[in-house]
Every structure is written in C-alpha cells, then in structure tokens.
Amino acid sequence: MIFTRSAKSTALALVATVGLFAQVQTAQANTETLTVAGGCFWCVESDFESVDGVKDAISGFAGGKVANPTYKQVVRGGTGHYEAVQIIFDPDIVSRDDILSKFFRSVDPTDAGGQFCDRGQSYATAIFAESPDQKAAAEKAKAQAASDLGQKVVTPILGSFPFYAADASHQDYYKGSKIVLTRFGPKKQSNAYKAYRDACGRDQRVEKLWGTAAPFVGH
C-alpha cells in the first residue's frame, strides 16, 4: 500500500493519539481515591502530598447535605460537612493500608470535638469508605490505632458521600507565594501556613500522642 506524505502524517498522528490515550487510561486505572477528614484540610493536603505514590491531594468538603458549600458555610456550622481531603494514590507504590496508617498517626483520633485548636464538627476526623474493601481496611486500621494507643479511637468510618472541592484559594495553600493578611500580620502564604500550623499545636499534640510513629511531625 502506498501512502502520500499527508496520509502518513495522519496515520502517525492517529497512532500517537491512541498511544497517549492508552497511557492516560492505564494511569487512571492504577490509582485509588481515599477521602479522609483530619481537621484543617491544608495540613492534611500538605502531609499526604509528601508521600511517595500519592498523585494528588485535594482539599474540600464531604459528609453533609448542602450541595456545593462554601468554606464560610462549612466552618460556620450547620451543613454537616467535614473539611476533607481526597487522596489519589498509586497502590502499586503506596498501599491503602499504609495511607490509612499514616492518616491515623497524623491526627488525634481520640478527639471527637475537632482537631487541635480548631473546634467543631467540621474539623473532626472521619474516613469516607467508597467500597466494602475500603471500609474493612479502615476498620482494621482504626482497631490497630486503638490498640497502639491503648485508648478509644472515635474516628467514624462513614459511607461514600459526594465530595465538593474547595475553591482554588484553598488548594496547595501550604506552598502558596502570594501575600495574605493573618493575625500574625502580612505574610507569604506558605509562611502563614507554617505559622498557623505551629500556633495550632498540631505537630506538638500528634508527637505527644504517637511519638516516633507520627509520620509528618515537623513537616
């Protein structure tokens, strides 16, 4: 069969497109999503984006009945939503069990009233299981956390809920470069995040509770 130059170019472009599509499909097939609530979503996002095998962590809201809630609505209370983070990871690199273990050891799962300086239901911990396998894994991780602590773990294992991503100003907050006004004065966003995290006592409490098992202290 004889191809003209134009036909050859078209054929090569088609092959490249099909190959790229196959790569994208494979990449998507090799990921799993786990949704957790661990207090301030900036902190949870920052922690898990440092884990090898985590493709992305997205700050948002889950667990409530209000569709497309705003940040102010959620923190004011009454929506039923938690500040939550969707962790998208490659299970060939980091396992679901490892993600769950790190989650429990990065929060205070004995506190039902919020997390650290942030109080109220929207800041409490939770895991949103999207499948029976995720639920079983979460229950196992919860039991192990309770055993390791020798204390009751109050983090609920909930079912699947719609997840609403927070607006762009809350995504990757921990590494933002713009200047923001804080109670500490004007600060570069990444520095404002560090000041907030330190003042809130997150790492101090987690280290006291979990000791050397805490994976993100000082992060």
Regions found by a protein language model. Give the residues of each.
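Bacterial N-terminal signal peptides that target proteins for export
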Residues: 2-13
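Flexible coil/turn and secondary-structure edge motifs
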Residues: 2-3, 25-219
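Exposed boundary/loop context
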Residues: 12-15, 31-32
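C-terminal segment of classical bacterial N-terminal signal peptides
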Residues: 18-26
